[in-house]
A protein has these predicted regions:
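Acyl-donor binding region in acyl/amide transferases
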Residues: 70-137
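A conserved beta-strand-loop-helix scaffold within acyl/acetyltransferase catalytic domains
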Residues: 4-71, 114-141, 145-222
Length: 222
């Protein structure tokens, strides 16, 4: 009989090791990147980065940020954990670790938004892990995956009629998309976001929040 491999968890200390594992999972995104939590640390927040090993092989990871709110201190894990969800032993160990880390920082609850498609199967799994549906979404209410390997024509063919109409309107108005890294660019972005928030009646992110996020990714040349 083959000897069972030892499962253990530890704090991550290497950006290179962390990002290599996160990038190896196609479902992952910037919400579990090293730099996203450098941004939170720059805000003065406590961050958690945990790696899970079977012997010397990394098999799972999650990053979270400790937030304070009127309803109490909590930890938010957006876009994670990154794990093989069919590995029940690993998933159980990971959520036990999440609970332990939350208690370490005096959190009264943990908010999790994994990279799973919304389905009866995924909801059943969350319930089995002791999770409850949150009254408010974390990061975004709806998320999708856009296959950039497809041609522009194929992408547009799969888009909604309303989306295609907006693209045609943007082209008619000579709207261009550019990538900027200057301080002036983020200031202008913050100004426009506040105008949009006022028009659409939602609460905008603060300029400090957006600027620190911008600076974290600019520093890493992302």
């Amino acid at each position: 009989m083959a000897e069972a491999k030892t499962l253990r968890a530890e704090d991550a200390s290497s950006r290179e090791v962390w990002d290599r594992f996160i990038k190896s999972h196609e479902e992952s995104n910037f919400l579990q990147s090293w730099d996203f939590y450098e941004f939170h640390a720059a805000r003065g927040k406590k961050v958690v980065r945990r790696l899970f090993f079977r012997d010397k092989t990394i098999v799972g990871a999650y990053a979270g940020v400790v937030e304070t709110a009127k309803r109490g201190t909590y930890m938010a894990i957006a876009g994670g954990p990154i794990v093989d969800w069919t590995d029940k032993k690993l998933v159980k160990a990971m959520f036990e670790d999440i609970r332990t880390e939350g208690l370490k920082y005096d959190c009264v609850f943990v908010r999790v938004r994994p990279q799973l498609e919304l389905s009866d199967k995924s909801l059943k799994l969350m319930a089995e892990l002791g999770l409850k549906k949150a009254p408010m979404y974390l990061s975004v209410e709806f998320a999708g995956v856009l296959d950039l390997k497809k041609s522009e024509e194929e992408i547009l063919a799969g888009a909604s009629q309303g989306f295609r109409r907006k693209l045609r309107k943007a082209a008619k108005n000579d709207i261009e998309i550019t990538a900027e890294t200057s301080d002036a660019a983020i200031k202008e972005f913050c100004r426009l976001e506040k105008l949009h928030a006022k028009r659409q009646e939602y609460v905008a992110f603060s300029s400090d929040f957006l600027t620190k996020q911008f600076e974290a990714f600019r520093k890493a040349k992302r």
